[in-house]
């Protein structure tokens, strides 16, 4: 995969997240499932802090082969979890029907809303449990490809937001 310089990805992350926060479905949402980004993903760290003042922000925690969702409270309550990802230690969240909007990470996306993850299937198992939430994939332009292989059971994104 292509790599970009830090200043370039920082600028691109800011532009992508500005488009995300202007999205009508995001603006209307009260409970949002985000992810704490890795170095090669759109940087969500400050975005999480910013919006946690106005919305209920959930983050995934890896537990075995699944993701459980926990309430984000503040940066000091994050701890390194699986794969070096910072994970919240806040309250366990199980009211999936209350989730209005999901920001989904991916290695690649296509314009049809298909997503390629990192191969562990965490989101493949999680997303079917949250069918009514609006699902937005966010990615750098080089992660948007012509076609992502998809199976009939794969959950498509409602929209891909990129620069």
Residue ranges and their predicted role:
Residues 68-163:
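Conserved phosphate- and dinucleotide-binding cores of soluble alpha/beta proteins
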Residues 1-97:
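N-terminal active-site beta-alpha-beta segment that forms phosphate/nucleotide-binding
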């Amino acid at each position: 995969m292509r790599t970009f310089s830090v200043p370039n990805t920082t600028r691109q992350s800011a532009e992508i997240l500005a488009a995300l926060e202007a999205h009508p479905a995001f603006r209307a949402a009260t409970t949002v499932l985000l992810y704490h980004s890795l170095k090669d993903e759109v940087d969500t760290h400050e975005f999480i802090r910013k919006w946690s003042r106005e919305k209920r922000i959930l983050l995934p925690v890896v537990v075995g082969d699944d993701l459980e969702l926990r309430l984000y409270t503040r940066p000091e309550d994050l701890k390194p979890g699986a794969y070096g990802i910072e994970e919240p230690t806040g309250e366990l969240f199980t009211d999936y029907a209350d989730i209005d909007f999901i920001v989904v990470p991916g290695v690649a996306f296509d314009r049809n809303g298909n997503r390629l993850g990192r191969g562990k299937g965490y989101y493949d198992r999680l997303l079917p449990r949250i069918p009514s939430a609006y699902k937005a994939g966010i990615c750098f332009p080089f992660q948007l490809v012509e076609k992502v292989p998809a199976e009939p059971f794969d959950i498509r994104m409602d929209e891909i937001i990129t620069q």
